[in-house]
Amino acid sequence: FNPTEAIRHVIVNGMVDYKSNQFYPTPESIVNDIEMYVGCTDGKRILEPSAGRGNIANRFENIHCIDKEELNTVILKQKHSNVICGDFLFYEVKKETDKYDIIVMNPPYNKNQWKTHVEHALKILAEDGVIYAVLPSGKESYFDNCEVLETYQNEFERTGITTCLYRLEK
């Protein structure tokens, strides 16, 4: 990782306001579980729609990343070639073959943004695709074909929230 571009961005634009942007990096213990459950990704189209600094994305090759914070995308581009700076909720795929086989996500939680993000992810998920999502606990009843894989307490610093790793299918 070459920090030159990231430092230049911070000097010009300042740091990201983490709280208002709902930026809570995915802890390594959860990332390890995501990687284990996803398994082999050969030949699969993979997306992380709220990629942040790449805690999840860095575990996968040829992953597509989206983040709305420019600083995060500057950092992501150091390791990944398919990076978009923009709001995931406005991201669309042009044709059926552009849909994703696997979507790994830790979306923002504030004001039920997690629900909107998962609903949008389902729209761009391939017919036999799978979503692995880190969400607040107790959300499995919101979606069909949703399974709790793991439960985590106090994994995200200064939040006190219980989260789960969910597996969703279309």
PLM features per residue range, with description:
Residues 1-170:
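Class I S-adenosyl-L-methionine-dependent methyltransferase catalytic core
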